[in-house]
């Protein structure tokens, strides 16, 4: 017990006394790796299934929207419980953090079981609801069957990973997620081609990879200094679920609305042909890859923010925030410059033989490169507000980029400029989201620093 208290004390000392620049970089390396691995193996999954045929590829695309919903629920419980845990650990209230860890985990697993069972019962209507045509419906059901079986593991793995991250143990989370991702890449061709399971093999590989990653993450929770998951710590308390809701609803809003926004863009782009859909899809994948690095860095910032906010070391929170904004802005500016210059070559890596795709994608990519440097502040502002428990402000800023501004910009710009409107809509939404988020974030920062002055 004394050893465990010493480890917890050592972690508290590190999180609240180590220079924030060094601390954030230490926390961010494993989270960046985790995010990039996830981005890469999602692209690899699509690559292998693409060799089966167009209908199989379409089925994976249809089910991917359902997987985004599972992820949104996982982030809801993971960020909701994790934010609260980091603040309580900063206050050195380990018992309350332990109750939240177990409550968040078991709640997510139960919701995953319910979604999985209901999905299996209604798999045909669910497949059609997600957008399956009669041609791809058989493939969708094959793939979706395994995804539904793995839903509890997928959802609760996201919770465990985020809880470990908010405790300052991102390396343990990285190991679990990376192991699952690498295993998925290895199993995909084996199940699809060697075992001749087709698209169902891709789903089976994903399910097994998620289950094994889940076990590794659970083991990570038993490492010294980490909070163990135990059913005896589960509490069906209104206050705990209120905190999960406060901390998790911004993530649910961001992830869920982003999926709806993507559907809207694909529908409008579809009016200009398959090349437009393909081009915008390629640009989205590229942007998501670089965005994953920014989110990964932000996930390194969040536990530092949560611990020090809980410990009332507001000056360290402010320093951590602005350091994170500077690093991500510089990174995205470099990406934007090279992306703008090399745009046609980057798009051609994905679809070299279609000049229409390259032309449409290059213009859209360059348009987004113009607003790309603003994304660092937008992401960090949202993560800061979410971590300190400003649920309403965090939800608004989370919704702003992909819904409040993107969908109206898309509809308006398409009406006036046609396909060009589709290509520039995300850049326009980014500028609006930046102008919207900045005053909200700065106001909350000023309120926090006023509290710092009162303490001193």
What are these regions (language model features)?
Residues 15-47, 51-52, 68-80, 84, ...:
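N-terminal transmembrane alpha-helices
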Residues 48-68, 135-139, 199-202, 240-247, ...:
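Interfacial/gating helices of multi-pass transporter permease domains
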Residues 36, 40-58, 127-134, 190-197, ...:
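Helix-terminus/linker motif at the lipid-water interface of multi-pass membrane proteins
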Residues 69-72, 184-189, 214-218, 289-292, ...:
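Hydrophobic transmembrane alpha-helices of multi-pass small-molecule transporters
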Residues 57-117, 154-173, 266, 279-343, ...:
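Small-residue-rich hydrophobic transmembrane alpha-helices
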Residues 26-45, 146, 180, 209-213, ...:
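Transmembrane helical elements of multi-pass membrane transporters/channels
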Residues 1-28, 85-152, 194-249, 305-371, ...:
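Short alpha-helical transmembrane segments in multi-pass integral membrane proteins
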Residues 78, 147-165, 175-181, 202-215, ...:
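Short runs within selected transmembrane alpha-helices of multi-pass transporters and secretion channels
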